[in-house]
Swiss-Prot record:
GO molecular function, one term: iron ion binding
Domain of life of the native organism: Bacteria
Protein name: Biotin synthase
Keyword Cell membrane: no
Originating gene: bioB
Required cofactor names: [4Fe-4S] cluster; [2Fe-2S] cluster
The protein's annotated pathway: Cofactor biosynthesis; biotin biosynthesis; biotin from 7,8-diaminononanoate: step 2/2
HAMAP family: BioB
Binding site for [4Fe-4S] cluster: 53, 57, 60
Record GO biological process: biotin biosynthetic process
Catalytic reactions of this protein: (4R,5S)-dethiobiotin + (sulfur carrier)-SH + 2 reduced [2Fe-2S]-[ferredoxin] + 2 S-adenosyl-L-methionine = (sulfur carrier)-H + biotin + 2 5'-deoxyadenosine + 2 L-methionine + 2 oxidized [2Fe-2S]-[ferredoxin]
Free-text cofactor note: Binds 1 [4Fe-4S] cluster. The cluster is coordinated with 3 cysteines and an exchangeable S-adenosyl-L-methionine.
Subunit structure, interactors included: Homodimer.
Length: 346
């Protein structure tokens, strides 16, 4: 039995129809009840196997069905993955996410996946993977290896889903989330704004997520990154206020979940990102690439954090390998210069 309020579509629709400033005020109040409003969880995402995916997700440049110019790459060597994780940690990330362009992993891949989970965990980082669909055995093996989070997005509402993906069903996505949860792994699941969906579809997506038996611990909200060669390359741009509104509704509906600004941040100016944080976003992906799409450079993120008075969650640093962590702390703590201003002091 669910241990949290069940939402109805009419209730969610009412939230989307609220005046924006009233909605933001409500979302910020709820956010402060459950989180430190000045703290942001920082994750890094690495593509451990890029391209040649057999699925037909219309937004994705990694699909083998579309000519996007993306070159397929084999699985990364274990040592290369661990080196990337170490650099991510020392740049300030507390969670290391690893993604593979698969419909699902094969049994032959499991020892490799278990090894990199164990290696990243040994560094003191939280681990997350996104590998497509899982069966019960695979979910349990990843749990036994120490995997903390598994990402499997619902993408959109059940009603609109068939317009975007035909190679796996909505129910298969829900089934994977259930298997992950039953294995004892935390769930990361969200969706994409800008696929051509209606506001009702956005409400339907959040309704599905919030009404899971246990809501996801992490909810990534992506803004569509339009890639030439994909069927959605000519979609209309997402209005910034519509995106901010979606963040706020997600925060209200899932008050204890981390709401993550995910793909599309490169397209957002600082003011839009600031309003997303006000709306209750408290997690970002950090670094120059998000799988195969651009992401703001690390220094740019640090500058924005300092302007807004935000602090990344801290992580332990390996002795003798802390240059980037020192730069992170120096950027956030040094007195104002011409490059920065303290928004909290205005």
């Amino acid at each position: 039995m669910a241990r949290h309020p069940r939402w109805t579509l009419s209730q969610v629709t009412e939230l989307f129809e609220k005046p924006l400033l009233e909605l933001l005020f409500e979302a910020q109040q709820i956010h402060r009840q459950h989180f430190d409003p000045q703290q942001v969880q920082v994750s890094t995402l690495l593509s451990i196997k890029t391209g040649a995916c057999p699925e037909d997700c219309k937004y994705c440049p990694q699909s083998s069905r579309y000519k996007t110019g993306l070159e397929a790459e084999r699985l990364m060597a274990v040592e290369q993955v661990l080196d990337s994780a170490r650099k991510a940690k020392n740049a300030g990330s507390t969670r290391f996410c690893m993604g593979a362009a698969w419909k699902n992993p094969h049994e032959r891949d499991m020892p490799y996946l278990e090894q990199i989970v164990q290696g990243v965990k040994a560094m003191g980082l939280e681990t997350c993977m996104t590998l497509g669909m899982l069966n019960e055995s695979q979910a349990q093996r990843l749990a036994n290896a120490g995997l903390d989070y598994y990402n499997h997005n619902l993408d959109t509402s059940p009603e609109f889903y068939g317009n975007i993906i035909t190679t796996r069903t909505y129910q298969e996505r829900l089934d994977t989330l259930e298997k992950v949860r039953e294995a004892g792994i935390k769930v990361c699941s969200g969706g994409i704004v800008g696929l051509g969906e209606t506001v009702t579809d956005r409400a339907g997506l959040l309704l599905q997520l919030a009404n899971l038996p246990t809501p996801p611990e992490s909810v990534p909200i992506n803004m569509l990154v339009k890639v030439k060669g994909t069927p959605l390359a000519d979609n209309d741009d997402v209005d910034a206020f519509d995106f901010i509104r979606t963040i706020a509704v997600a925060r209200i509906m899932m008050p204890t979940s981390y709401v993550r600004l995910s793909a599309g941040r490169e397209q957002m100016n600082e003011q839009t990102q600031a309003m997303c944080f006000m709306a209750g976003a408290n997690s970002i992906f950090y670094g120059c690439k998000l799988l195969t799409t651009p992401n703001p450079a690390e220094d740019k993120d640090l500058q924005l954090f300092r302007k807004l008075g935000l602090n990344p969650q801290q992580t332990r640093v390996l002795a003798g390998d802390n240059e980037q962590q020192q730069r992170l702390e120096q950027t956030l703590m040094t007195p104002d210069t011409d490059d920065y201003y303290n928004a909290a002091a205005l």
